[in-house]
């Protein structure tokens, strides 16, 4: 495996940005996410510069032991370049509290320092309360305000969400609390459509406890449908929240959303909408919230 860490500008404070563990990771992707991170960090108003890192290691299907071994060797090299006042990495796709914990332990062992060098830690060793929910909740509060400004109410809206990770789960939860009905979720193998509204408890059980695929969802909700591959944006909804990964919403998807009368698209993931799709949505009067503003809750509430 190859590890990466890209740092942009630390003139006003330490670099800050996630560590992504996913087979698709390469230098290009990390640079592009890091560049986006500069603007996202500046929008939080906090004194932090842009950075991003990760590796093409795939934690999927690996045992705790294997993940731990990887995280430790990754940190053995990474620790030379980071520090509480230099660069503070965080979680991202494939990197949750478990992985951050393994890395933090290794950093502490090598450097002999118990400091704020990583964010997204568990509560028992210095993490911040509500960090897990921050990105998804922040996305919905942002969306709610954005709709209000445009004279619309999120209450009663039908929503499509892509993804089934940290951002997606809590975005779905908060959307339901605000009175909207979320009918989709997706992962790397396929997507589910639940006409009665996604069951967050079932989703958490599948994704956070069992770390399984969404195919399991039908066992919990027999009324739902599971579809292989892409297609989450083909459902007729009022609001679309891409919360999976970069470049997941293409021009064709944007055309489908517009045809189905979608009112707004708000990004939960980093750069999930392609440039052509973004332009098409804006030309057709769809309210569009870029991720660098809409998902910045994750940076702001990270410890």
Language-model-detected regions and their locations in the chain:
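Glycine/serine-rich phosphate-binding loop and adjoining beta1-alpha1 elements at the start
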Residues: 41-154
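Short, surface-exposed connector motifs at secondary-structure boundaries
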Residues: 82-85, 152-156, 235-238, 257-264, ...
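General beta-strand structural signal in soluble alpha/beta enzymes
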Residues: 32, 86-90, 113-118, 161, ...
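Rossmann-fold NAD(P)-binding glycine/threonine-rich loop
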Residues: 244-303
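Glycine-rich phosphate/diphosphate-binding loop of Rossmann-like nucleotide-binding domains
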Residues: 119-122, 127-236
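Generic N-terminal targeting/processing segments that precede catalytic cores or assembly contacts
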Residues: 1-39, 47, 56-57, 61
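Predominant activation on well-ordered alpha-helical scaffold segments within soluble catalytic domains
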Residues: 27, 31-35, 68-79, 100-105, ...
């Amino acid at each position: 495996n190859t590890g990466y860490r890209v740092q942009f500008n630390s003139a006003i404070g330490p670099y800050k940005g996630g560590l992504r563990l996913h087979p698709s990771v390469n230098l290009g992707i990390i640079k592009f996410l890091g560049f986006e991170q500069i603007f996202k960090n500046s929008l939080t108003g906090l004194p932090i510069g842009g950075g991003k890192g990760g590796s093409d290691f795939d934690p999927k299907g690996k045992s705790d032991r294997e993940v731990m071994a990887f995280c430790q060797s990754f940190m053995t090299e990474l620790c030379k370049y980071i520090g509480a006042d230099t660069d503070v990495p965080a979680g991202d796709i494939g990197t949750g509290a478990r992985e951050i914990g393994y890395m933090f332990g290794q950093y502490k062992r090598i450097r002999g320092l118990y400091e704020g060098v990583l964010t997204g830690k568990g509560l028992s060793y210095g993490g911040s309360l509500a960090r897990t929910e921050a990105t998804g909740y922040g996305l919905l509060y942002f969306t709610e305000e954005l709709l209000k400004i445009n004279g619309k109410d999120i209450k009663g809206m039908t929503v499509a969400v892509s993804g089934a990770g940290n951002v997606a789960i809590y975005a779905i939860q908060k959307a339901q609390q605000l009175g909207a009905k979320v009918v989709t979720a997706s992962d790397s193998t396929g997507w589910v459509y639940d006409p009665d509204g996604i069951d967050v408890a079932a989703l958490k059980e599948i994704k956070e406890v069992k770390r399984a695929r969404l195919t399991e969802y039908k066992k919990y909700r027999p009324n739902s449908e599971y579809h292989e591959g892409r297609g989450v944006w083909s459902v007729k909804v009022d609001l679309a929240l891409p919360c999976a990964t970069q470049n997941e919403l293409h021009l064709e998807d944007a055309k489908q959303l517009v045809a189905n009368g979608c009112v707004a698209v708000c990004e939960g993931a980093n750069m999930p909408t392609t440039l052509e799709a973004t332009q098409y949505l804006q030309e057709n009067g769809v309210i569009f919230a870029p991720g660098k503003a809409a998902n910045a809750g994750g940076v702001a509430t990270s410890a």
